[in-house]
């Protein structure tokens, strides 16, 4: 699973996800893309499960780019612990995702294979997603 090698702060503030994605909202590398339509904190497990689904359906053909990286530590306190006594320990890594942000890109596979792979991968994510195509001959479908 993805995690940063080192970070400046071990327990960052959570912050808020406001607005839409102004960066990473257009296809940069591949021919097809998986675009988020809602805001969410994607965990490294969800990103890895989606990556495995995409690569397995493409039968390891073509190329896959992961455009999000889980670089924020999410903390949690143990169950049945009294309030206070500081912030909890880092539990897992997450990536903040805003609406219209590109999550994955594909290249080197036919349109039908990419469409079905993205459709299957959408079940691994907790948000609604949309498929984008670089050339506008194919339809852009919400999955």
UniProtKB/Swiss-Prot annotation:
One of its GO terms (biological process) is mitochondrial translation. One of its GO terms (molecular function) is structural constituent of ribosome. Gene3D superfamilies: Ribosomal protein L10e/L16. It is found in: Plastid, Chloroplast. Keywords: Chloroplast, Plastid, Ribonucleoprotein, Ribosomal protein. The keyword Transmembrane helix does not apply. Its main location: plastid. GO terms for cellular component: chloroplast; mitochondrial large ribosomal subunit. Belongs to the universal ribosomal protein uL16 family. Part of the 50S ribosomal subunit. This is Large ribosomal subunit protein uL16c. It comes from Cyanidioschyzon merolae (strain NIES-3377 / 10D) (Unicellular red alga). The gene is rpl16.
